Amino acid sequence: LSKGIEYTVRENMIYFSLDKPGKFSIEINENRVNNLHVFANEPETEVPNPDDPGVVYFAPGFHRPKDLPGNAFTISSNTTVYLAPGAVVNGKFICNNVENVRFIGRGYIDNPVRGFEFTHSKNIEINGITVINPDHYTVLGGEVDGLKINNLKAFSCKGWSDGIDLMSCKNVEIKDI
């Protein structure tokens, strides 16, 4: 492996051990199109109590928005949105004219219009979430002051859909994507 990770192959299976977190692409016979992505995240250190006020908790399982047409969760100020490991959310998250909102966890956003849509807001954070097959941008930001994106994973087979599009934003920090 290019990262120097030792591995063995037995009966069409690859075995390896990791001693630290990392993001890996496993490519068989140099096939970069049909690869396997492995995300070895650090253990979660912050799991909010689902009963705490200001917490929107998505437990393991499938979740759809209840809005019409059923494609968006609108988030209020001073909220922590937690996607637990095994949580699959089928919809985008909207923050408009809000502040102090965090999206954390190891869950997935699957097939949304966009993963995240932030406008006219302050102090927004994304950490650890994976977005799969959005129809458009993974993160769309407009006039956001204080946006932190860390350990975001995004995949899509659709055009213009796996990126971060920011317009008139300031104090933006993007790392480990």
Region locations from a protein language model:
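Extracellular/periplasmic carbohydrate-active domains that bind, remodel
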Residues: 1-177
